[in-house]
Amino acid sequence: DRVAPQDRSNGKMRVSGSPEMIETTEIVKKAAGQLEKSGCDVVEITAHDGISLIGHWCPCEEPKRTIVAMHGWRSSWSHDFGLIADFWRNNHCSVLYAEQRGQNNSGGNHMSLGLLERYDCLAWTNWINEKTGKSIPIYLAGVSMGATSVLMASELELPDNVFGIAADSAFTSLHAIWKHVSESNLHIPYACLLYTSDAADD
């Protein structure tokens, strides 16, 4: 859901005492702020199921390729891609940074761990082709749940100019990720969670 469980929210307040972790967090935060101030255009499309999707369009001069960047679960476009944004720009990449459904400024109250997000990814590739005239290659890139979203999008009928996918830290299955979330974030045994879910369906 859009609203995080209370335990998950409190967990964000806990940081390790590692100086390296604190330093890394500050570097990521600074890069995110720089990307947010880089002058990207805020754009909006309507998903296949009618919800509003927000993106940040960052065209470059003389682009050689376009990237659709999908961020992860309970994250943001600037947080997940702030550190790589300059690299992409310096290598002639225009980028569409998507805000995933059910998060931040996009519509919807739920995330589907890639099941619906794959269609959103397709919608963004179509938007780019309408914007640019299908003139240059498109690459799909994602982190965490965003990585799973772009991988699942590969089974759809993507435009011919989608040339590749970069998936960073995708999860292997819905069961695997729910086991991790239930045990690490919700502190509920996975078997108990499955039993509760089955009981609710009866």
Q: Residue locations for each model-derived region?
A:
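Membrane-embedded segments
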Residues: 48-119
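Short coil/turn segments at beta-strand junctions that form active-site/ligand-binding loops
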Residues: 64, 135-137
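Short, hydrophobic alpha-helix immediately C-terminal to the catalytic nucleophile
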Residues: 82, 122, 151-155
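Alpha/beta-hydrolase active-site loop
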Residues: 112-132
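Primarily recognizes the serine-hydrolase "nucleophile elbow" in alpha/beta-hydrolase
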Residues: 137-181
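A catalytic-pocket lid/entrance helix-loop region that shapes and gates access to the active site
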Residues: 179-194
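Conserved small/polar residues in nucleotide/adenosyl-binding loops
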Residues: 195-202
